[in-house]
Structures are given as C-alpha cells and as structure tokens.
Design a protein with these regions (language model features):
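Basic, polyanion-binding surface patches
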Residues: 2-185
C-alpha cells in the first residue's frame, strides 16, 4: 500500500491481505442496506445485509453476500428462500440492531420492534416500512470470502414515497441532491 506521491492523495496497491488497505477500498464504496429475513428449522432470523443488489431485470434476480459463520448462512441454505427488505432512511435503527447482533447470541426480534407482515409466497416474515420488499427463491450459490446467494423474485412490493437508506464509510446517509446528467454531444 503506497501513495503515488506526497502531493497525490491516492492510495494504491495489491496487498489485499492488509486489513487497513481492504478497509480503505471498502470505505470508498456506496451501498444500500437490506434486512434479510429467513425461516428455517423452526426459527426465524433477520440480518442486516449491506451487500444486496438487483442483478437482472428479466428474470428479476437479486444477490446477497453472507459470511459462512453467520447463523443466517445455514438457515438460507436450508430454506432455499428469503425476504429481502431494502431499508428506508427511517430504518437505520433496525439495520443497526440486526447488524450488531448475532442469532448465535440473542434473538434479534426481541431487541427491537421489527414491524412485520406475512409474506405472500415464502415462509419468512417481511419488514414493514421498507422502500422495497422482495420475496426471493434461491436459484444458486457461489462461495467466495462470503457466499453469494443468487435468487429470483417471486413477489415484490415497493413504496415510491419512501427514500432508501444509504451506507458509506461505515455510516448511514439519506439520498442527497440529484446530480444533473451531462448532455451527450
């Protein structure tokens, strides 16, 4: 990890084994925040998931990245389905509670008032008040440092009056002002 010059603010390198360098790279990314809900083996869980995104329009597919040591990981494998609830900017507290605690230690549903409603096509409850709720069926997995769960949407609902919660540099944000698109010549 080196800076290209004293006057240059860039940090560059290929030492991805260096935790601080990886953290610096990660903190330059911008993501939304989703709450993953799952029911399996007679239990339910909710997990904050920063790495959640749409990956296909037709068919409508999403992916989430979940570390293998998370309790949610094995539940997702067993269930083969999950709820993907993209947080509104009013739900940072729900993200914080579900992202700061593990089902290995505590029942997160008891730590906060997670407003839920019954799903239409899956077993897991859905989180009320989200900007987008997607009921998903897993169609594949790919193991990296985390496991990518690739899923097809089987039901969705969204609220166009709400604004998404944004995560950057370890902090929550509201969506800001629109940057005008430049004119194409």
């Amino acid at each position: 990890m080196t800076s290209t010059s004293d006057a240059d603010p860039f940090v560059e390198g290929d030492d991805f084994g260096d935790r601080e360098f990886r953290r610096g790279v990660w903190r330059q990314t911008l993501t939304n925040v989703a709450l993953v809900t799952v029911s399996a083996g007679g239990r339910q869980n909710v997990m904050a998931c920063e790495w959640a995104m749409m990956v296909s329009h037709a068919p409508l597919c999403f992916t989430i990245a979940v570390h293998q040591r998370n309790a949610t990981h094995d539940m997702l494998l067993e269930a083969g389905e999950f709820g993907l609830n993209f947080c509104s900017d009013e739900q940072a507290h729900l993200s914080h509670v579900s992202g700061s605690n593990s089902l290995h230690d505590v029942d997160k549903w008891q730590l906060a008032d997670f407003p839920t409603y019954p799903a239409t096509r899956i077993e897991a409850p859905m989180i009320e008040g989200s900007v987008l709720n997607v009921e998903c069926r897993t169609v594949g997995t790919h193991r990296l440092g985390h496991t990518l769960f690739i899923a097809e949407a089987v039901w969705a609902r969204y609220d166009p009056t709400k604004s998404p919660l944004v995560f950057h540099g370890g902090k929550y944000f509201h969506v800001g002002e629109q940057v005008p698109k430049p004119q194409v010549l």
